[in-house]
């Protein structure tokens, strides 16, 4: 049977951070969604803890970052301990990197999900708990799915399906997609209260003699996540875990440590697996359904949310008739390489965190003392740590949506994130205006000179592309961006009179010298965008009027 005319356009299986991010971004772009989850209700255990700068930049565009930061704890250091000695304290303040969030935010997943659910509720979207996706099959221009609730079965047909249903994904299984990789060490997570006199703006790696314990601070006073990498099946009941952690931390810190009984314990195999395809027909997978990682670098939830953020704008553009379906092929083309690079980096991080080497207790003090003494070398190591952990080094330079390499050119290179430090945003009006413009869910085309073509482009592409002229003075009554000190143009590395095209997720797609409307139109079409006169429908994909009431193609601010 065909999908219902006014039914959901996208069915999302899974109401964790990935599914909620996807639902939020699709709804923000006026795509109708239905969100289901097999669980009876929201999770109550902490699970993922870190939200890194790249994810916070995305959350700023979503309008969520302030709420997350208000509830979380910033961490800007990484400290290593052995036998009562503090061997080294790495500075992981990301202030030298292009971000307004120069820290990793410690906020347990329960609260992250709460914030996303609250915002979704404000957009009129609820979660259907206790509803399991039992089966699914892509069928041409639709997806047939079987849902189960309280033993009853419901057959549904939807235009699109996304599996954000975790590492045991039903969607992945039904599509015949396999996670490939390995599972090696067994670790233990425990949420505990410590009396240990440790700085709470730092993560702490404590070498215990037989392994390591990684300590990550919660926002709550005295509460820590303890990751025991030396666990070997000694028992996972609360009292056994408490005694083991107290003994291990006392050996590593060289002093008694009071440890509470844990409020949550999880024993798990460290997995490093991913799939080689993220789409089958009109079905997609994202997050843990597509890749599972070691928790050593705290990237799992962040990568999943960024999967969802990448997919959402592309799917919305296609569903609403603003782009050809070929745009969706770029989801896997961009995100699979990211997953592969992350597997490689987390293998390294896992080895460094676990330190399962007989010579580590001897080699660590020598190596880290040398590193601490050679300041330029220490700064290089810190920069590498920050680039990897922050997510800001992630780029799409090889994407089909990226034009030009930017080799040797100044400013942001095509395929790289457009972001600025908080200080630069405060100092330069043009960068402040850019930051605000990036909260619009459309593409952003900046024209650093207007030869009269902006209005024509807006009429043809304004529903999908925010088109803004950049001028050297304030434009109180108009939509132009003011760049009085030329900082915006120089930051982007755009030639005088040129242009820059920024994707809805904040990455620079292309830039160049202005050579008329024809060139820009060709570039937009090469990115699979459809002009209004060829788009299948004036509003959404069903041909209804635009729900915001705007006239066709007219850019709104």
Swiss-Prot record:
- A Pfam family name for this chain? FAD_binding_3
Chain residue ranges for the region called Disordered: 530-557
Q: Report the cofactors.
A: FAD
Reported phenotype of the disruption mutant: Cells lacking this gene are unable to produce the tetracycline intermediate anhydrotetracycline (ATC).
Report the top EC class in one word.
oxidoreductase
GO BP, sorted A to Z: antibiotic biosynthetic process
Keyword field contains Oxidoreductase: yes
Gene Ontology molecular-function annotations: FAD binding; oxidoreductase activity, acting on paired donors, with incorporation or reduction of molecular oxygen, NAD(P)H as one donor, and incorporation of one atom of oxygen
- SUPFAM superfamilies, sorted: FAD/NAD(P)-binding domain
Q: Give yes or no: UniProt keyword Oxidoreductase.
A: yes
Protein origin, superkingdom: Bacteria
Q: Which positions are annotated as binding FAD?
A: 9-38, 278-288
**Family recorded in the similarity comment:** Belongs to the PheA/TfdB FAD monooxygenase family.
Q: What is this protein called?
A: 6-methylpretetramide 4-monooxygenase
Protein source organism:
Streptomyces rimosus
């Amino acid at each position: 049977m065909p999908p219902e005319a006014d039914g959901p356009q996208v069915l999302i299986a899974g109401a964790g951070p990935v599914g909620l991010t996807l639902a939020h971004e699709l709804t923000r772009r006026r795509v109708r969604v239905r969100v289901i989850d097999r669980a009876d209700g929201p999770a109550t255990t902490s699970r993922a803890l870190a939200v890194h700068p790249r994810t916070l930049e995305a959350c700023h565009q979503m309008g969520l970052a302030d709420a997350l930061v208000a509830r979380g704890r910033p961490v800007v250091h990484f400290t290593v301990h052995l036998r009562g000695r503090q061997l080294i304290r790495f500075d992981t303040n990301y202030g030298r990197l292009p971000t307004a969030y120069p820290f990793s935010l410690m906020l347990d997943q329960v609260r992250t999900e709460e914030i996303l659910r609250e915002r979704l509720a404000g957009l009129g979207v609820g979660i259907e708990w206790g509803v399991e996706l039992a089966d699914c099959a892509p069928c041409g221009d639709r997806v047939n799915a079987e849902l189960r609730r309280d033993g009853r079965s419901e057959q549904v047909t939807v235009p699109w399906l996304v599996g954000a249903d975790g590492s045991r994904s039903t969607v992945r299984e039904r599509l015949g997609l396999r996670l490939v990789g390995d599972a090696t060490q067994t670790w233990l997570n425990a949420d505990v209260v410590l009396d240990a006199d440790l700085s709470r703006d730092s993560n702490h790696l404590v070498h215990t003699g037989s392994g390591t314990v990684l300590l990550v601070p919660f926002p709550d006073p005295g509460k820590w996540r303890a990751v025991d990498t030396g666990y070997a099946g000694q028992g996972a009941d609360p009292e056994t875990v408490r005694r083991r952690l107290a003994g291990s931390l006392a050996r590593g810190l060289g002093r008694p440590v009071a440890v509470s009984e844990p409020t949550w314990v999880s024993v798990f195999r460290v997995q490093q697996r991913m799939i080689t395809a993220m789409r089958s027909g009109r079905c997609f997978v994202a997050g843990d359904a597509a890749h599972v990682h070691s928790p050593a670098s705290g990237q799992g939830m962040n990568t999943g949310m960024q999967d969802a953020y990448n997919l959402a704008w592309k799917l919305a553009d296609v569903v609403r008739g603003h782009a050809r379906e070929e745009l969706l092929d770029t989801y896997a083309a961009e995100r699979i390489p990211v997953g592969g690079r992350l597997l490689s980096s987390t293998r390294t991080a896992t080895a460094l965190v676990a330190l399962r080497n007989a010579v580590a207790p001897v080699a660590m003090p020598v190596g880290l003392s040398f590193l601490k003494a050679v300041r330029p070398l220490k700064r290089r190591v810190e920069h590498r740590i920050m680039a990897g952990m922050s997510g800001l080094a992630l780029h799409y330079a090889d994407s089909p949506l990226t034009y030009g390499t930017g080799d040797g050119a100044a400013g942001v290179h095509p395929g790289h994130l457009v972001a600025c430090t908080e200080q630069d945003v405060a100092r330069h009006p043009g960068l402040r205006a850019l930051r605000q413009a990036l909260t619009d869910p459309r593409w952003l085309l900046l024209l650093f000179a207007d030869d009269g073509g902006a209005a024509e482009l807006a009429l043809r592409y304004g529903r999908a592309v925010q088109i803004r002229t950049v001028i050297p003075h304030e434009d109180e009554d108009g939509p132009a961006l003011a760049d009085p000190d030329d900082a915006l143009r120089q930051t982007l590395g755009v030639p005088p009179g040129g242009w820059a095209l920024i994707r809805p997720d904040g990455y620079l797609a292309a830039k160049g010298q202005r050579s008329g409307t024809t060139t820009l139109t060709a570039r937009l079409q090469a990115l699979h965008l459809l002009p209004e006169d060829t788009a299948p429908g004036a509003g959404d994909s069903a041909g209804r009027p635009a729900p915001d009431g705007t006239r066709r193609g007219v850019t709104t601010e």
